[in-house]
């Protein structure tokens, strides 16, 4: 028997465009967008700064324009990094200030969103939904195995800020030695920062993918329970 897996996956893929009927927490939604945008800008500006730093000496690109560009990218990094790290603090303060209201609003938002998603999956049979749920379940452990034990957005931003500082010091006429603790220690610190940045970015990717699959499985499993109990 051929199940309509492709149809179900298309329906699931379209769920991202669904929006709950009531936007009960617009401030949190906007803060989340600000955090995502600031992270993307921070990563892009860091890689541009890294390119300028790598070409600054060996390729004789030293000029006022290069230095001003590097300095501008550094300040953009600092501003975006501080913005990214500040959003969770603002969210926490807002949550504590109106704890009951935030909990209720979050619950209403989640239930309303889940109901729309479940409604879109109800036309499919129990066998089809169970099959897709099992397919997702099989893939979840594989993604979990690729995740590191630590690392995420905050560690990525902190490592970017440290590496950006070392980059601007090099562009300003210094060297990698003497930026933090001196000589070999600085090279080790920079290497560790690059490793932290790499693991953090990989962790963010795989955890986002894992969270997405877990949410899909939860919605499909809820749909299965509803079909079994009420149809």
UniProtKB/Swiss-Prot annotation:
Taxonomy, superkingdom: Bacteria
Transmembrane segment boundaries: 39-59, 70-90, 156-176, 189-206
Keyword Repeat part of the UniProt annotation: no
Membrane topology summary: Multi-pass membrane protein
Alphabetized UniProt keyword annotations: Cell membrane, Membrane, Plasmid, Transmembrane, Transmembrane helix
Location in the cell: Cell membrane
Cellular compartments per GO CC: plasma membrane
Signal peptide: none
Family indicated by similarity: Belongs to the FliR/MopE/SpaR family.
Name listed for the protein in its UniProt record: Uncharacterized protein YuaM
Native species: Escherichia coli (strain K12)
Gene that this polypeptide is encoded by: yuaM
